[in-house]
Each structure stands twice: as C-alpha cells, then as structure tokens.
C-alpha cells in the first residue's frame, strides 16, 4: 500500500489519515502546523496545497536521508522561535474523541511547567492485543521495564530545550 502512497495519505472512508489529524489539530484551536516529510513527500505537499486548509501549514523535507522521529522533529523546530510543540504521529487514526484528552494533557503540561509529556493509553484498550506495552507508570512517571501496561499513542508535547545538545541526524 505505501510503496506508491505515503501512509498519512491512505484513506479511511473518503478522508486521509493526515486530513483527520489536521482536523483534530484545528479543533484544538491550533493555527500553525509544521509537517516533516521524507517518503513521497511531494505527494503530501501537493495534497496540502489542494486541500487549502484553514490553518497555516509549512512543510519541511528531511533531505537526502530519513531523519526518523527525533531528527524529523528537530528538523522542524530548529529554525523557529516557538518553545513548546504539540507533536502528532500523522499515521495514527485520530478523531475528535481525543480532543478532551489532548486538552487535559496540554493543561497538565503547562500548569506543571514540564519539558515533555506523552499521551498514553492502557494497552488493554488497544484493538491489537499483541502489543507488549511501551511504559509502566510508577510514582506518576512513565518508565520502561517489565510489565509495561501503557502504549504511546502518537501525541506528545515537548519543549524545544530538549533538543539543544543534539545535532541534526537520524534518531
């Protein structure tokens, strides 16, 4: 499926996964979106132009080599003065049901002056029962270890300062 179409442009019913993501972001009141691309990025660029969304969307390419998640995020934030970023995996199946949870996560992040927060779910709620889990919760902190009961579902908020000591590369 994704040899000729980037995963975010796959459709569920008549809407792409990326469009669902952008609609949720818009529902959150966010007016500026940065998108990092690599595989078939020209298709994503054309899709954004064609749809004419009501938010300001800037697209930045990885370049010759894929930067993966960390490098892709760094590629986006290195040239901006913004300090805090809400990051979505655009190949996650987002819908409006997540808006309340994301708003609660934002409120918690800013009221507690955090540097990073991840949106996680109990792995029992996943349709895919093969997940081992990404994290466990201990003393209100996510940790990796045995008995990981929570899965990262593709949304996080972080402060740009987390990337200060990294060079732009694949990570």
What are these regions (language model features)?
Residues 85-86, 93, 98-110, 123-127, ...:
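Catalytic-core segments of class I nucleotidyltransferases/pyrophosphorylases
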Residues 9, 135-137:
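A structural signal for short hydrophobic beta-strand segments in well-ordered beta-sheet cores
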């Amino acid at each position: 499926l994704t040899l000729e179409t980037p995963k975010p442009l796959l459709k569920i019913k008549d809407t792409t996964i990326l469009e669902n993501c952008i609609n949720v972001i818009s529902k959150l009141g966010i007016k500026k979106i940065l998108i990092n691309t690599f595989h078939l990025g020209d298709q994503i660029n054309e899709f954004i132009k064609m749809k004419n969304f009501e938010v300001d969307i800037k697209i930045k390419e990885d370049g010759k080599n894929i930067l993966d998640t960390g490098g892709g995020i760094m590629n986006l934030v290195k040239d901006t003065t913004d300090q805090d970023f809400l990051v979505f995996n655009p190949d996650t199946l987002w819908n409006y049901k997540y808006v309340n949870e994301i708003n609660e996560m934002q409120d918690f992040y800013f009221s507690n002056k955090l540097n990073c927060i991840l949106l996680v779910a109990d792995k029992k709620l996943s349709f895919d029962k093969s997940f081992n889990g990404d994290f466990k919760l201990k003393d209100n902190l996510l940790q990796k270890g045995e008995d990981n009961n929570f899965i990262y579902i593709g949304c996080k908020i972080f402060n740009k300062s987390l990337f200060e000591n990294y060079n732009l590369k694949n990570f």
